[in-house]
A protein has these predicted regions:
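N-terminal, active-site-proximal structural segment of metallo-dependent hydrolase catalytic domains
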Residues: 125-237, 295-305, 311-321, 332-334, ...
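Extended non-catalytic accessory segments flanking core domains
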Residues: 25-164, 168-181, 189, 216, ...
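Bacterial Sec-dependent N-terminal signal peptides
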Residues: 1-27
Length: 527
């Protein structure tokens, strides 16, 4: 056996494959890949007790029974482009991978893993809990129900940018004091240098209140906001900017895009970092929702993108057009586009940004695993962080802070007197760390690895060595075929000797390892 030698600190080499199993009395059901396992395999065990020795993951916790699976279930258009074979595969695997688990008298968050689950199989899609499981966490959760925020801007020169959908923050809300307490507790915990909001009441009253409470709760901050001269009107909401004026200053006036949904839901502002004079464009947006009844091109095309997709595409183009105009005027290409775009990662509006040459930071840093929103037991990200190639070189991290989407909605301000930050909105805030002097630890979107060497022999899987995840940086691997179709979706690297089963079908494949904010591709052949 011979190692692949890389310039990085981890290596990939070939070993014999292992399999996961479900234990049923003395009978084993082999689960070679949790990402493709289907509930059809439970058919022989209906009315029997089983013990799962693969972790079972909670996909929906809105009510009992919980929806669970051997994998995290994602919205199809978050993982694959509309009208493709790949999206049909994701849709099929979602429907065949979900089970209903009843009888579990324990509050779990979406994404929680249940180890050693003992259950009665009522049908191929229905289980009844029989024995106490041991839960363990994905990000921001552990066995004592603590959600942690990873610091992605941990240097003196870094900026932390946070964009959040505030889920209709209105001064006249009957539960406003509860909502305000939850929002302020969350923003206080995040402690960002620059904040962008959507679903905030038009006018100055709501944004002024948030700034006042933040300054009272964070004495080291001196936040201020940008007035847009709007007035409160019914249910109208806007995009808004809040920044620490000791850290940043505005350069020029705020620019509002009035087309599409709402009059003030898309805005751009150039900011300058005071310590070094570096500038960048910050774009905060709230695109047209998928709900409602569209007509013509805005009608539901039944491709997974919902209503008003054409309008969202027009909104994306309007953002690009304003950016192009600013580049022509200011000669600065650095832009960070954020907000609730009401489009998942592979949908047409996001494709417009990528085809223009911009970069999806969620995808770059976290492969296929990012999410900011849950709907119908499926995760995905409507809340984006997209940037130009010049900005990309200055990004030192991006995360969705899962303080909302994974939570049971009984914590919402209108259903509970709870005033913690948990479930302050239905969307997770998205955080981006920036180092505007250009020295951020980022990577080329298409890097090359030299000095690779491998002897395959008859081996049936790869091993990724020394790239295990840490609390500060989660590592993943994914496998794609030569046409770009995902074969193994992004999987967290849990150990320093991570086993990766090779695909069954012959062909050429690409293994991507996402490690320490870099991505490393490795091409291999299954004979």
């Amino acid at each position: 056996m011979k190692n692949i030698h890389m310039k990085t600190r981890f290596s990939i080499f070939v070993m014999l494959a292992l399999t996961c199993q479900i234990l049923v009395a003395q009978t084993h059901i082999k689960v070679n890949d949790s990402n493709t396992w289907t509930t059809d395999e439970l058919a022989p065990y209906v009315n029997q007790e089983v013990i799962f020795d693969v972790p079972i993951i909670v996909s929906s916790n809105a009510s009992s029974p919980y929806t669970v699976s051997t994998r995290r279930l994602f919205t199809p258009t978050n993982q694959a482009a509309p009208n493709t074979t790949a999206i049909k595969t994701v849709t099929s695997l979602n429907s065949k991978g979900a089970m209903q688990l009843s009888g579990l008298n324990k509050e779990l968050r979406c994404g929680d893993k249940i180890y050693n689950l003992k259950a009665r199989v009522n049908s191929t899609t229905s289980l009844t809990y029989l024995d106490g499981p041991c839960t363990n966490s994905r990000a921001y959760y552990d066995t004592v129900n603590v959600r942690r925020l990873v610091n992605i801007a941990d240097c003196d020169t870094c900026l932390l940018v946070c964009t959040s959908n505030l889920e209709n923050y209105f001064m006249g809300n009957n539960y406003h004091s509860r909502q305000r307490a939850k929002v302020i507790n969350a923003l206080k915990h995040i402690d960002a240098d620059l904040l962008g909001f959507v679903e905030l009441e038009c006018g100055d009253a709501a944004i002024k209140e948030i700034v006042s409470y933040l300054n009272s709760n964070l004495p080291h901050r001196t936040y201020t906001y940008i007035s847009d001269n709007t007035t409160a009107s019914g249910t109208d909401t806007k995009a808004a900017f809040v920044y620490d004026k000791n850290v940043l200053k505005t350069y020029g006036d705020m620019m509002v895009i009035t087309g599409g949904a709402g009059k003030a839901r898309k805005a751009m502002q150039i900011f300058e970092q005071k310590r070094n004079g570096e500038r960048f464009i910050y774009s905060v947006n709230h695109f047209k929702a998928k709900s409602g009844t569209g007509t013509g091109a805005d009608a539901d095309q039944h491709d997974g993108q919902g209503q008003f997709n054409a309008t969202r595409c027009q909104e994306a183009q309007a953002v690009i057009d304003l950016y192009k105009r600013l580049v022509g005027q200011r000669e600065d290409k650095d832009i960070l586009i954020m907000g609730d775009l009401n489009a998942y990662a592979k949908e047409d509006p996001i494709r417009k940004f990528l085809e223009y040459g911009l970069i999806d930071l969620h995808r770059s840093f976290h492969a296929d695993t990012s999410y900011s929103y849950q709907y119908g037991g499926l995760a995905g990200y409507l809340d984006h962080a997209i940037c130009s190639p010049t900005m990309y070189k200055q990004v030192c991290g991006v995360i969705g802070f899962h303080v909302n989407s994974d939570e049971n909605d009984r914590y919402t301000y209108d259903k509970s007197s709870d005033q913690t930050m948990f479930r302050y909105s239905d969307h997770d805030p998205v955080l981006v760390g920036l180092r505007l002097d250009g020295s951020a630890a980022t990577y080329d979107p298409k890097p090359e690895i030299n000095n690779l060497e491998i002897i395959r022999g008859n081996a049936s899987h790869l091993v990724i060595r020394d790239a295990e995840s840490t609390d500060e940086q989660i590592s993943y691997y994914a496998i794609y075929d030569i046409s770009g179709r995902p074969v193994v979706s992004a999987t967290k690297i849990e150990s320093n000797m991570e086993s990766v089963n090779l695909p069954d079908a012959s062909g050429v494949y690409i293994l991507y390892v996402y490690y320490k904010a870099k991505v490393y591709p490795y091409k291999f052949i299954v004979p």
